């Protein structure tokens, strides 16, 4: 029996409700009662598996912990007085060719992490993943659940200009996401889809700078000398420990690496450490010699300012940062801004600030995270029922230009060692070549309706801490599998092009930005 109040639904909503809901589903003003295809935000969706010794987690060195309580951007060197607020030692970045990356522990994807798999077997988990392999999928689920809600820029100054085409998340952030699931001894291990990444990556410089700076900020001066090539000290190297937090959502086990701990941070005291290349570097990766020309000199404004960097973080990085923080039970992120040569300043961004920008409030952010993770686990379970005990790829994609779009789930059987290539020069050739066998492919759609305390909502814009947000969903297999297969190949081709593309903004724009920065430093 279906019970609803007419005043709560428009004609289209009633039609969709009758079309999508299964029999036996009951709605009233207080609760939702149904079978397994209803998710609740109040459910204990994500739980800690292990207890972490916080003393083993790294700490910020060089008095950088003084940044944490302020929550606002702090210049390393005051642009007006030229006085250093912290040790001048922090201002220069060691060139990547002088840093011994061989001393750092190597990243292990879930399919190669024996300890992660051991933990999974001990608790009876079926799926294992890491924050880096899951956040892309969870970003697509955010867009699906939120109905493509735009980010909130209320923390920016009133004078900051936002053009109409910059009010949404970046194109890369919005693009479809793909992972490879490796079936090993009863476990499904979720790795990044390496077949879509061109090697070497165009971001290799920024990645290496980030790795060296994470060490730079968490060891003292004497220890850091030992990471140089050749070592500048005869001391004994104290290797940095890898500390992991494991969390579980039903049959899904997630690994999160913990970077930093400080008792001044409320609750867990754990936070993430991020390094952020400034606008001029991100937009001009083909000319490393110009990296040092772009400097941050202002707090506010659209150019050469901290505010510009914060604006770009909201559009491109906060989604990933906030998901990683929640998956690792972290309270925020410490961000260092640089141009690969100089460090300009630091900021601690708490999770509540990222929630405000992405979701509008922490209540919505926390509730959506629980729903997001539950839905992801259900999708994985459904996918393995189609291709049981097989290795395969999963791609999630949702469209922003149609009302109430379904979530598309593309599944493709792919062996662990398979690394199918695409001709980047000819997308039509990829379509005609039938690079994916129809017998090893399946496309699904996820349809969903949302409710707050049993009342249907097209979009959840506000949520009280005491309210329950629920999602009623179901899977369907569209008939036009051939067209969906072609669409899947197009999406893969598009992702690979974007991954391989080097940013080349108009030369006049870069010249304008660089000129502003250089003129400021000449005057001062």
Curated annotation (Swiss-Prot):
Keywords: Mitochondrion, Transit peptide. GO terms for biological process: mitochondrial RNA 5'-end processing; mitochondrial RNA catabolic process. The keyword Repeat does not apply. GO terms for cellular component: mitochondrial envelope; mitochondrial matrix; mitochondrion. Residues 1-12 form a transit peptide. Belongs to the PET127 family. This is mRNA degradation protein pet127, mitochondrial. It comes from Schizosaccharomyces pombe (strain 972 / ATCC 24843). The gene is pet127.
């Amino acid at each position: 029996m279906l019970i609803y109040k007419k005043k709560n639904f428009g004609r289209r909503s009633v039609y969709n409700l009758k079309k999508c809901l299964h029999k036996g589903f009951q709605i009233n003003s207080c609760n939702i009662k149904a079978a397994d295809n209803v998710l609740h935000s109040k459910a204990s969706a994500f739980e800690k598996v292990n207890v972490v010794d916080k003393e083993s987690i790294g700490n910020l060195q060089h008095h950088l912990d003084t940044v944490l309580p302020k929550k606002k951007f702090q210049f390393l060197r005051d642009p007006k007085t030229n006085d250093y607020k912290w040790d001048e030692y922090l201002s220069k970045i060691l060139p990547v060719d002088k840093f011994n990356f061989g001393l750092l522990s190597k990243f292990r994807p879930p399919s190669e992490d024996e300890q992660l798999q051991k933990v999974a077997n001990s608790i009876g988990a079926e799926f294992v993943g890491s924050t880096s392999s899951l956040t892309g999928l969870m970003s697509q689920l955010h867009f699906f659940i939120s109905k493509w809600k735009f980010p909130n820029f209320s923390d920016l100054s009133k004078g900051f200009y936002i053009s109409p085409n910059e009010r949404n998340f970046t194109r890369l952030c919005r693009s479809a996401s793909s992972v490879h699931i490796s079936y090993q001894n009863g476990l499904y291990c979720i790795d990044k889809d390496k077949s879509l990444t061109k090697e070497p990556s165009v971001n290799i410089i920024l990645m290496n700078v980030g790795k060296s700076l994470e060490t730079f900020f968490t060891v003292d001066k004497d220890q850091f000398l030992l990471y140089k090539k050749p070592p500048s000290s005869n001391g004994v190297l104290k290797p940095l420990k890898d500390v992991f937090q494991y969390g579980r959502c039903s049959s899904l086990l997630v690994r999160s690496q913990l970077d930093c701990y400080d008792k001044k941070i409320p609750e867990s005291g754990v936070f993430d450490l991020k390094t952020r290349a400034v606008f001029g570097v991100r937009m001009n990766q083909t000319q490393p010699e110009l990296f040092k020309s772009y400097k941050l000199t202002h707090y506010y404004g659209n150019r050469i300012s901290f505010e510009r960097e914060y604006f770009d973080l909201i559009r491109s990085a906060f989604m990933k940062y906030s998901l990683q923080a929640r998956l690792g039970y972290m309270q925020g992120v410490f961000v260092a801004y640089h141009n690969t040569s100089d460090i300009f300043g630091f900021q601690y961004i708490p999770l509540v600030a990222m929630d405000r920008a992405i979701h509008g409030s922490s209540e919505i952010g926390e509730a959506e995270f629980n729903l997001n993770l539950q839905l992801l686990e259900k999708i994985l379970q459904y996918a393995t029922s189609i291709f049981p005990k097989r290795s395969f790829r999963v791609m999630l994609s949702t469209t922003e230009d149609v009302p109430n779009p379904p979530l598309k789930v593309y599944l493709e059987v792919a062996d662990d060692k398979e690394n199918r290539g695409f001709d980047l020069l000819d997308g039509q050739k990829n379509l005609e070549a039938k690079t994916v066998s129809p017998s090893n492919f399946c496309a699904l759609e996820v349809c969903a309706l949302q409710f707050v305390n049993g009342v249907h909502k097209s979009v959840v814009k506000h949520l009280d801490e005491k309210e329950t947000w629920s999602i009623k969903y179901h899977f369907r297999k569209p008939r036009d599998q051939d067209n969906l297969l072609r669409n899947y190949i197009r999406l893969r081709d598009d992702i690979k092009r974007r991954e391989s593309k080097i940013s080349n903004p108009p030369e006049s724009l870069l010249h304008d930005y660089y000129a502003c920065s250089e003129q400021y430093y000449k005057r001062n």
